[in-house]
């Protein structure tokens, strides 16, 4: 058992916090998934970052860029401002946070309001940088069985 403190900022041990999700257990809520994804960046767990992105977007991720950013950054902290569960079927949520890191260009701070969707008992990050070619009447990429316009359309970046 690790005695390392979890990088997500909870103050808990990694094994009792985000490490539990990194080992394959589903995050119980969008905020827990977001915290575990931040910890995955800190720890270089690229497979986890890909696996927790909406499955329809995973092929569009640049694994090498994610790996480079993770490895070349010194992660300075995470502050969660709010977590908003919107309900519905499938369930959607927003998490607003600020992540801080240092790299070769200096210190950075990034504030984001991320979108998440739950399907089959698992939460997924909807990546606004990975565009999908979908019409409003196409099946939703979250696999809910609904039309895109009635499900996740409002949660994708414009």
Curated annotation (Swiss-Prot):
<dbReference type="InterPro" id="IPR004027">
    <property type="entry name" value="SEC_C_motif"/>
</dbReference>
<dbReference type="InterPro" id="IPR032710">
    <property type="entry name" value="NTF2-like_dom_sf"/>
</dbReference>
<dbReference type="Pfam" id="PF17775">
    <property type="entry name" value="YchJ_M-like"/>
</dbReference>
<dbReference type="InterPro" id="IPR023006">
    <property type="entry name" value="UPF0225"/>
</dbReference>
<dbReference type="InterPro" id="IPR048469">
    <property type="entry name" value="YchJ-like_M"/>
</dbReference>
<dbReference type="Pfam" id="PF02810">
    <property type="entry name" value="SEC-C"/>
</dbReference>
<comment type="similarity">
    <text>Belongs to the UPF0225 family.</text>
</comment>
<protein>
    <recommendedName>
        <fullName>UPF0225 protein Pfl01_1218</fullName>
    </recommendedName>
</protein>
